[in-house]
Every structure is written in C-alpha cells, then in structure tokens.
C-alpha cells in the first residue's frame, strides 16, 4: 500500500471508524524507505523515535473500541500491559518513552518500571487525547517494528513501475544467501530511469543493481549495466538512486536487475504471491520476472513459484 504509492492519505479525508473507504483518494506523500528494527531492541526503538518521530509496532489488543474495558488496561492511568500467549492483532505508534513510569500504574504485577508512550488510531476519545502507556514488560510491544525513514513529496519521480502491489508476502531463493532477480517493464514514454527499490529480507544485506535496455528475452540479461551498489544495516524496504540516469524510449522493454546477499538467509528475495485468504486475489499475471543463482543462467520465476519479484523502478520524463 505505502510502497506502491497508494497511500498514505490524510485521516481527515478518510476518517477511521466510519466503515467507508474513498477510492478516489491519492497518496499525499511517497514512502521510499521503511526499516525493520529487530525484536525487543528497545534502545534501537528509542533511537528511531528520537530520530524519525515514531515507530510502528504490534500489540495484542484486548480492547475492541475506545469505550471498551479490559483487565489489561487501567483507564485511570491510561496504562496497558498484556502478558500471555496471544499473538499481535493491532498496530500502534511508539512516540516516546518513560523509563521511570511506575509499574504501579498497571493492572498487572510487573518486575519493574518503564513504558513506551504510544498513539492509537482511535481518535482523541481514547487514553489521554489518543495517547497511552504500554509497559516495557508487555509480551508483544517491540517485537514487530517498522520505522519510516524516507518520506518524500509526491513529485519526487514522474513514474513508478511495479508488479508487486501487495509487497513482501514471502521469500524465494536457492538455499543460499545470494540470488539474482530481474523485473521487466515497458517504458510509458521517453524517460530517464533514476532509481529502483527492493526489500532487504535480513540485516547487513549487500546489493548490486543493474539495468538492461531493449529487453527481448532472458538472453538480454547478459548485457547488464551496473547502476548502484551498497550495504544495508537493517532489513526493510529501500529506494536506491542510480549512479547515472539510464535513458529509455517510449515502448521500450527494459529490466531492472537486483543481486542481493543476505547473511544467514536461504531465501533472500522478497516476492508477492497468493499465500492465504488475505492475498488470494493478488494479480500475479501483471509482471515478468526472472531469477538466477549465478547471474548467467536465468529462469522465469513462475517455473519456481507463481509470484512477482518485489523490485520497482522509478523514472522522470525527459
């Protein structure tokens, strides 16, 4: 949704809780980078809050609305803590912390003090004007964390090319930590390719990006033009600017190639595929993708898994 430029939209234009969605809304910003913070790394979470303003995290929410009650929520102190085996079912944004926030503010007996200050999506009627505390000892707080590290204006690029509207659903690989992947697109006009985006599925990933012009079939992938390389500290979604723009002509088929090494992984390439009921209607016929173990012998990704590779391209008109 966010990586595909379908959002975000302003809450005033699509209010929470009205059970309606305005399909005519367009993104008011373009999200170009999202980093994943490792589970329960509270210091990294605090650092990200300080640097970027907020960290999205998942909790088990026993409340069903802003008016609900729960043994895990102390309404008088706006303090929540769940300890148990239930899986996360709700996202909130960590916007601050208080290491000395008393454990006595919670309904649960806890080992120590400390809490994150979080903002919910239920409006000003919940908590203290929409904010509340979640104990450091909550089972799920800080386990699944995303921080939005590059949010740009909507005029940053003229075009986005993509076939993975659902984004990172699963992973593909050759039972080793490296893989080549290529997505093929058709230029809408006379353009200059400026950047590509992809997912690093684990920390400390190294990448190389290439472009292939005048793509005809997989043999065209022998003519890769190097455009960028680097190393990424965290798992996440990244947009990388090319070292030089690559001009393509209207109607020209071209490929963006990603070579990625993710230490410890055996399936380092992020893919979109029909994994469950939530993704069973995903369009897997809108893309053309190839994979390779060594960069010389390529096969269509559909021969391995009916899927789309999560590689996008960005261009400007010329």
Model-derived features with residue positions:
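Predominantly the structural core of cysteine protease catalytic domains
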Residues: 1-115, 119, 124-202, 230-234, ...
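Ser/Thr- (and often Asn-) enriched beta-sheet segments in non-cytosolic proteins
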Residues: 33-36, 192, 208, 226-231, ...
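Residue-level signal for short segments within beta-strands and strand-turn junctions
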Residues: 96-98, 196, 211-216, 260, ...
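Short, surface-exposed secondary-structure junctions/capping segments
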Residues: 142-154, 239-242, 285-291
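Short beta-strand-to-coil "C-cap" segments at the C-terminal boundary of structured domains/repeats
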Residues: 149-152, 214, 312-318
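Aromatic- and Gly/Pro-enriched, solvent-exposed loop/edge beta-strand patches characteristic
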Residues: 204-284
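Short, surface-exposed beta-strand/loop patches at domain edges
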Residues: 259-318
């Amino acid at each position: 949704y966010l990586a595909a430029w379908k959002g975000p939209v302003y809450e005033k234009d699509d209010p929470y809780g009205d059970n309606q969605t305005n399909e005519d809304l367009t993104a008011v910003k373009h999200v170009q980078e999202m980093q994943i913070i490792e589970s329960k790394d509270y210091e990294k979470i605090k650092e990200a809050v300080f640097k970027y303003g907020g960290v999205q995290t998942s909790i088990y929410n026993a409340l069903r609305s802003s008016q609900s009650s729960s043994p895990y929520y102390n309404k008088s102190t706006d303090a929540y803590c769940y300890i148990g085996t239930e899986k996360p079912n709700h996202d909130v944004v960590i916007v601050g912390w208080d290491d000395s926030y008393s454990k006595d503010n919670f309904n649960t007996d806890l080992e120590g003090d400390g809490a994150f200050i979080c903002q919910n999506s239920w409006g000003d009627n919940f908590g203290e004007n929409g904010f509340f505390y979640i104990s450091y000892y909550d089972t799920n707080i800080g386990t699944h964390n995303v921080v939005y590290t590059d949010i740009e204006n909507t005029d940053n690029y003229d075009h986005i090319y993509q076939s993975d509207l659902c984004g990172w659903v699963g992973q593909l690989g050759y039972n080793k930590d490296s893989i080549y992947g290529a997505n093929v697109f058709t230029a809408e006009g006379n353009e200059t390719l400026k950047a590509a985006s992809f997912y690093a599925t684990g920390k400390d990933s190294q990448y190389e990006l290439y472009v292939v012009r005048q793509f005809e079939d997989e043999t065209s992938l022998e003519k890769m033009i190097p455009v960028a390389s680097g190393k990424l500290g965290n798992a996440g979604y990244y947009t990388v600017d090319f070292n030089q723009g690559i001009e393509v002509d209207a109607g020209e088929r071209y490929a963006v190639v990603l070579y990625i090494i993710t230490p410890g992984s055996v399936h380092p390439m992020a893919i979109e595929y029909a994994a469950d009921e939530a993704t069973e209607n995903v369009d897997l016929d809108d893309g053309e993708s190839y994979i390779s173990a060594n960069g010389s012998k390529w096969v269509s990704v559909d021969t391995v898994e009916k899927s789309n590779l999560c590689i996008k391209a960005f261009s400007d008109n010329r």
